[in-house]
């Protein structure tokens, strides 16, 4: 039996009974409104915890009873306490935060022994003026650490794993800290055949449709007025891949998105633009190459050639790291399995 009060004051009481592997505890939260947000509409957050951690969670008012294996109950308790503290700080709670907290609790139990006195309290976090961005998976955690450690980082994997999002967040953090002068955004415009001169409008209008995911991240992570001003002054620069030849990019964070659609020569040209006090982040999904048949992906070749080069980070995401709606991970996994079946007897280029 235990009835502590947490340091935050969020956990009012809890009780526990244990019979071998079976455990039951009761948690009570002192703010009814926050408890309601914690449990989710119609208890959807509790339902997700039940599904992912193999426990039974029964809610009564601001109390929740957790029953199941000792490990499952302990992980569920850490998830609920962590999310409640997030709400007490005034932060918004979305379904992705719940999934991230669950993955953290699982990682604490499987990647290293959990000891409340010594365990890492959470995955890595990027603190920005507008908001904090926290890794939700072990791969994202490793990605953030790689971004801080290396001048060049490759992040590859399926859509929805946060590769581009975290790259932009890291770039914004360095920009806000004045560690770099500029953020440079680029991607190959395969759909336009890189012949951007034939498209109407100025350079930003030509490239905007191809960089929309990066723009969305910028506006979500920074004050829109600051983004617009930085675009006007060139502190945030849109640089089509085809227009980067001959430049040396210094004191900047350069992000190349959708890099799976670069050719070998384009990738080599891009990587050799790295200048003094600059960081490069290359993201892409090797399974979504839109190059003409027979054309080797510059991303696939670069990650192969540079895998053991000192000073370069490589993070590979899988379907398990998808942080969009939980169905997205299943969809990606289904497509990946289907793609493997007809591969036999066929010449598949990397």
Say what each PLM segment does.
Residues 63, 128-138, 146-256, 260-350:
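Conserved helicase motor core of SF1/SF2 NTP-dependent helicases
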Residues 118-132:
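Conserved adenine-nucleotide phosphate-binding loops and their immediately adjacent elements
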Residues 47, 53-56, 62:
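Compact, well-ordered interaction domains used in eukaryotic information-processing assemblies
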Residues 17-36:
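Short glycine-/aliphatic-rich beta-strand segments at the starts of folded cytosolic domains
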Residues 1-19, 341-350:
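Acidic, low-complexity intrinsically disordered tails
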Residues 34-51:
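Short amphipathic alpha-helix segments
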Residues 58-120:
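Interdomain "pre-motor" coupling segment immediately N-terminal to P-loop NTPase/helicase cores
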């Amino acid at each position: 039996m235990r009835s502590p009060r947490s340091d935050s004051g969020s956990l009012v009481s809890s009780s526990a009974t244990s019979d071998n592997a079976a455990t039951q505890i009761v948690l009570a939260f002192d703010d009814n409104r926050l408890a309601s947000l914690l449990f989710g509409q119609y208890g959807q957050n509790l339902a997700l915890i039940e599904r992912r951690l193999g426990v039974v969670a029964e809610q009564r008012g601001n109390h929740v009873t957790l029953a199941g294996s000792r490990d499952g109950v302990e992980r569920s308790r850490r998830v609920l306490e962590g999310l409640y503290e997030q709400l007490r700080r005034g932060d918004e709670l979305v379904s992705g935060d719940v999934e991230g907290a669950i993955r953290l609790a699982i990682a604490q139990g499987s990647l290293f022994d959990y000891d409340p006195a010594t365990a890492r309290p959470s995955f890595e976090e990027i603190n920005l003026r507008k908001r904090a961005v926290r890794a939700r998976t072990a791969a994202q955690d490793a990605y953030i650490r790689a971004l801080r450690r290396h001048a060049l980082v490759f992040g590859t994997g399926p859509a929805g794993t946060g590769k581009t999002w975290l790259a932009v967040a890291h770039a914004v953090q360095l920009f806000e800290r004045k560690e770099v002068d500029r953020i440079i955004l680029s991607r190959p415009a395969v759909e336009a055949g890189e012949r951007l001169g034939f498209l109407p409008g100025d350079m930003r209008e030509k490239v905007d449709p191809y960089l929309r995911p990066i723009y969305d991240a910028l506006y979500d992570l920074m004050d829109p007025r600051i983004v617009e001003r930085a675009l006007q002054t060139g502190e945030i620069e849109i640089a089509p891949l085809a227009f980067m030849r001959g430049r040396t990019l210094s004191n900047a964070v350069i992000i190349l998105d959708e890099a799976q659609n670069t050719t070998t020569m384009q990738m080599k040209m891009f990587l050799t633009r790295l200048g003094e006090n600059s960081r490069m982040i290359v993201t892409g999904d090797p399974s979504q190459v839109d190059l003409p048949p027979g054309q080797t992906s510059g991303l696939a070749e670069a990650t192969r050639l540079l895998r053991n080069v000192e000073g370069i980070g490589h993070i590979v995401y899988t379907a398990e790291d998808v942080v969009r709606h939980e169905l997205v991970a299943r969809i990606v996994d289904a497509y990946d399995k289907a793609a493997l079946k007809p591969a036999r007897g066929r010449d598949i280029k990397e």
